[in-house]
From Swiss-Prot:
The gene is mnmE. GTP binds at residues 234-239, 253-259, 278-281. This is tRNA modification GTPase MnmE. Its EC number is 3.6.-.-. Exhibits a very high intrinsic GTPase hydrolysis rate. Involved in the addition of a carboxymethylaminomethyl (cmnm) group at the wobble position (U34) of certain tRNAs, forming tRNA-cmnm(5)s(2)U34. It comes from the Bacteria. Pfam families: MMR_HSR1 (PF01926), MnmE_helical (PF12631), TrmE_N (PF10396). (6S)-5-formyl-5,6,7,8-tetrahydrofolate binds at residues 26, 88, 127, 458. GO terms for molecular function: GTP binding; GTPase activity; metal ion binding. NCBIfam families: mnmE_trmE_thdF (TIGR00450), PRK05291.1-3 (NF003661), small_GTP (TIGR00231). It is found in: Cytoplasm. Belongs to the TRAFAC class TrmE-Era-EngA-EngB-Septin-like GTPase superfamily. TrmE GTPase family. It comes from Streptococcus pyogenes serotype M2 (strain MGAS10270).
Amino acid sequence: MSITKEFDTITAISTPLGEGAIGIVRLSGTDALAIAQSVFKGKNLEQVASHTINYGHIIDPKTGTIIDEVMVSVMLAPKTFTRENVVEINTHGGIAVTNEILQLLIRQGARMAEPGEFTKRAFLNGRVDLTQAEAVMDIIRAKTDKAMTIAVKQLDGSLSQLINDTRQEILNTLAQVEVNIDYPEYDDVEEMTTALLREKTQEFQSLLENLLRTAKRGKILREGLSTAIIGRPNVGKSSLLNNLLREDKAIVTDIAGTTRDVIEEYVNIKGVPLKLVDTAGIRETDDLVEQIGVERSKKALQEADLVLLVLNASEKLTDQDRALLNLSQDSNRIILLNKTDLEQKIELEQLPDDYIPISVLTNQNINLIEDRINQLFFDNAGLVEQDATYLSNARHISLIEKAVQSLEAVNDGLALGMPVDLLQVDLTRTWEILGEITGDAAPDELITQLFSQFCLGK
């Protein structure tokens, strides 16, 4: 991407397309004020104070036609999100009016922004680093308040600060090692340098490994738990799904095989987003459509983070029940004995001891499912510690793992008695890898790819 294109004036609709109370068309760049003024009838936007909202009308400069009655926000560089002049035109919501204003601005000299380009400019102008830019999208995509809390902390710079501090410490260590090698003042300088490198490398490794330990929790809160609801036909899987969702999404009848495919929905369980997959009942069937659903159910079971196995407590165990118990035994599984409001006939002695008796009809013990999920995945600890920094982004996790591997190579080399100057290479590589997280050492291709995943207008 050319420098000219990076820093021309861009525009986009920043609110979702469709009907709504308010629509926002955003401008950013050197000519933002002049372009906005060319279609605005009201105060002179190039003379108003920064961070003010100004009433007026958007007009077509060629015909003089009024397009809409608007409020225009003016924010002057550098105290803006992009650190450029920014104008936001607040219109009445609607596809026609926002698109008409957008086309006017483009005709007056603005360029249509690419996905994520406003945030990309904030990054290029030093307003945010790469982790903070990614946090913007995480906030937009957050499915629960806990996921949003983690993203907001990242946007606030908690992860950036930790990474930058570690990189600085690594740089200080490399400088000290270099001085000791090039300007030895003591006879035992080699032993001193080796001891320093061992101490600091172990310190860095411990810090990054502690950060990695937050990844499981952070990733779950960011992306959710893929949860398969399995069981033979007509044991109450769809009723359980509807109960958790608190709305009727799945067909509930007394006819076996009414769920003929996989139904997916998200539900918030105490701050954890569960991607609930209601599977077709797993059984032998001659119905071709249902057979396809059964095969998809087996695949969903294999890929799930969590399995909710539903059994009918009012009937004796069947061969299908036993097959599902065996099939799911290596999974993170919660066994639910449904229909406990009826006479119990199931053989409890043939089941593991950790089952939960429930009644979807009466809501009995549904809350215990949430408690068991907390026990399985969070060791009964709180989901988010207020002052903790969490890894939740797969890119960050992968790079931290690579950084730890580089530090392990340094420690292994020290144990083998390798020369310190050779081990500097791996420590330098650790410093570079951590720089990829914040964007200080990230290739242009990666930056372009990351911002292309953003929505238009952000």
